[in-house]
UniProtKB/Swiss-Prot annotation:
GO terms for molecular function: ATP binding; ATP hydrolysis activity; ATP-dependent protein folding chaperone; unfolded protein binding. PROSITE patterns: HSP90. Coiled coil: none annotated. It comes from Bacillus licheniformis (strain ATCC 14580 / DSM 13 / JCM 2505 / CCUG 7422 / NBRC 12200 / NCIMB 9375 / NCTC 10341 / NRRL NRS-1264 / Gibson 46). Molecular chaperone. Has ATPase activity. This is Chaperone protein HtpG. It comes from the Bacteria. Keywords: ATP-binding, Chaperone, Cytoplasm, Nucleotide-binding, Stress response. Residues 342-552 are annotated as: B. Belongs to the heat shock protein 90 family. The keyword Ribonucleoprotein does not apply.
Length: 626
């Protein structure tokens, strides 16, 4: 029995197979099970065109057996088997794929899928085994053969005894090292876990002998441990079943089984597409926010299967960031995988799937918003922030997709409203969509800047999250209505009498306002008579794109860039305080400076901005009270 050399550059190539292609050793089992599944598939496909062949699915299965005493692991199948020539051709040549050749020779039509295509998966066995033995008997043949190899040095082929057609792959596991515990691949529970992770949806039964406790025959209340053959994989994935066959409870059970979350899913999406790219997907919108969702540790992504075999536990490219909260899986026959089947080549199919999934998620959320507002608002409390980030990120690339999903608190209804709801009830004379920003609903409601807009009967959106104003700035408008902060210099509210009066005030008190600006020494861009204040004495407004709320948020970030809004101090010239200020301007310059500082600090406090010198501020209050 002469040892034969591999037909490829064996030592170098096999070394790459063992040490470089696969990131995790446990995937060897996935590869060998996939090969076994392919071997059974080949009989099935031949039976489709050969009337002399019959295919009874009950006769075909994969058996995994662990022998702890001899440190061997066997993966056996009842598939098509191999002849001596096929052993030589497929196992004697690294990267020669028998499955790919079978596909090409038989011109399999869409829907008839064999997993293997690279011809390297078998050699993953050498990651965990010193010696690999293959005993095989081809379907319809009377002869069996044994292929054996200890690695790159070569292999042997010799006659063997085997009763039925199929293939047994026997791994003599490596000895344990300080870094690797190869004994784990002899543990039934560990093997079941690997199968559940990667190969749960292989279409044929994967059987194992499992120890179970059963009542001892002839003895009352006594049990004995016996070996029982069990099928350890699910075989038919839920996503390939008709939706009409499934209930909400089935989806919830799948959600829990896959450990997508401890909560119940708020909604699910089950879709099957057979177009430019074929895929099945089950997606879940969770009820509660994951504890680490807004941390660096959170990883977005969907489980990705190719033909029922898990390829990636989290494929980030299938979800945009704004839908990163979605859990679930995708199974496709059309993916371009790399040689290890662990990563994807970034191709057109993947992008198409991701695009379609994004639309499905958006439509589901829109449907939830329309048909179950309470449930949608519950979702929005958890993940609305992420939708707003989606509007803002990537220079607004996704704003049109997301804008109808946004909710904001309203001054009129004191509840969350959509932009469409707001615009639909705008009076004809209202030019803008008005908003106010602050830490909470109650605090915004008390802002002096809201007085004029509220008096006109216009609705105000209350922005209570730091991302709100940035998202709206990126959105710019909705249904051709621009957004306008109640703190903006020009509110676009026409009032001829008030306009004339205000203009007169600015002219009449020009010197006073100039002196106030001088006293504040660059802290404000200007001082002017307010058109918006009714009962309050003073407020801050902002000219330009950066609002006061944006200044607060940007300067609170770790990379504080000391952003400054163009602040304008607005004075209510009809307020009693202004008369006191005017009297001081005419008669007591020191008091005038004192009052100016107090009014400015009062405006800062209203906005939630820090006072530069709290001690000086309290001393000034004492001077006024003394």
């Amino acid at each position: 029995m002469a040892k034969r050399e591999f037909k490829a550059e064996s030592k170098r190539l096999l070394d790459i197979m063992i040490n470089s292609i696969y990131s995790q050793k446990e995937v060897f089992l996935r590869e060998l099970i996939s090969n076994a599944s392919d071997a059974i598939d080949k009989i099935y496909y031949k039976a489709l065109t050969d009337d002399s062949l019959t295919f009874n699915k009950d006769d075909y299965y994969i058996k995994i057996s662990a022998d702890k005493e001899n440190r061997t692991l066997t993966i056996a199948d009842t598939g098509i088997g191999m002849t001596k020539e096929e052993l030589e051709e497929h196992l004697g040549t690294i990267a020669k794929s028998g499955s790919l050749a079978f596909k090409q020779e038989n011109e399999l039509k869409d829907g008839h899928d064999i997993i293997g295509q690279f011809g390297v998966g078998f050699y993953a066995a050498f990651m965990v085994a010193d010696t690999v033995t293959v005993i095989t008997k081809a379907h319809g043949s009377d002869e069996a053969h044994q292929w054996e190899s200890a690695g790159a040095d070569g292999y042997t082929i010799e006659p063997a005894a085997k009763e039925s057609a199929g293939t047994d792959v026997i791994l003599k596991l490596k000895e344990n090292t300080d870094d690797e515990n190869y004994d784990e691949y002899l543990d039934v529970h560990r093997l079941k876990a690997i199968i559940k992770t990667y190969s749960d949806f292989i279409r044929y039964p994967i059987k194992m002998d499992v120890a179970v406790n059963k009542p001892k025959e002839g003895a009352e209340n006594e049990f004995e441990e016996v070996q029982e053959e069990q099928t350890v994989n699910s075989m038919v994935p839920i996503w390939r079943k008709n939706k009409s066959e499934l209930k909400d409870e089935d989806y919830e059970a799948f959600y829990k089984e896959k450990h997508y979350g401890f909560d119940k899913p708020l909604a699910h999406i089950h879709t099957s597409v057979d177009g430019a790219v074929r895929y099945h997907a089950i997606l879940f919108i969770p009820e509660n926010i994951p504890f680490n969702y807004y941390t660096k540790e959170f990883e977005k992504g969907l489980e990705l299967y190719s033909n029922g075999v898990l390829i990636m536990e989290k494929c980030p490219d299938l979800l945009p960031d704004h839908f990163s909260f979605v859990k679930g899986m995708v199974d496709s026959e059309d993916l371009s995988l790399n040689i290890s089947r662990e990563m994807l080549q970034h191709d057109r199919q993947l992008k198409l799937i991701a695009k379609n999934i994004s639309k499905k998620i958006k439509n589901e959320l829109k449907s939830l918003l329309k048909n179950d507002r309470e449930k949608y608002e519950s979702f929005y409390q958890s993940f609305g922030r992420q939708l707003k980030f989606g509007v803002y990120n990537d220079f607004g690339a996704h704003k049109d997709l997301l804008k109808d999903l946004l909710l904001f608190y309203s001054s009129k209804e004191k509840k969350l409203v959509t932009l469409e709801e707001y615009v639909s009830r705008m009076p004809e004379d209202q030019k803008y969509i008005y908003y106010a920003s602050g830490d909470s609903y109650d605090r915004i409601e008390k802002l002096p800047q809201t007085e004029l807009v509220s008096e006109k009967g216009y609705e105000i959106l209350y922005f209570t999250e730091d991302i709100d104003e940035f998202a709206i700035k990126m959105l710019a408008n909705y249904q051709e209505k621009e957004f306008k902060s109640v703190s903006s210099g020009d509110l676009g509210i026409e009032n001829d009498d008030e306009q004339n009066q205000s203009d007169g005030d600015d002219s009449q008190y020009k010197d006073l306002f100039e002196e106030m600006k001088k006293t504040l020494d660059g802290k404000v861009k200007s001082v002017r008579a307010s058109k918006r204040l009714k009962t309050h004495s003073v407020c801050l407004a902002a000219d330009g794109e950066v609002t006061i709320e944006m200044e607060k948020i940007l300067n609170a970030m770790p990379d504080n860039q000391h952003v400054k809004a163009d602040k304008v101090l607005e004075i209510n010239t009809n307020h009693e305080v202004f008369k006191t200020l005017q009297n001081a301007f005419d008669n007591d310059k020191d008091k005038f400076k004192l009052y100016t500082g107090l009014l400015y600090n009062q405006a800062l406090l209203i906005e939630g901005l820090p006072i530069e010198d709290p001690v000086e501020f309290t001393n000034d209050i004492c001077k006024v009270m003394a």
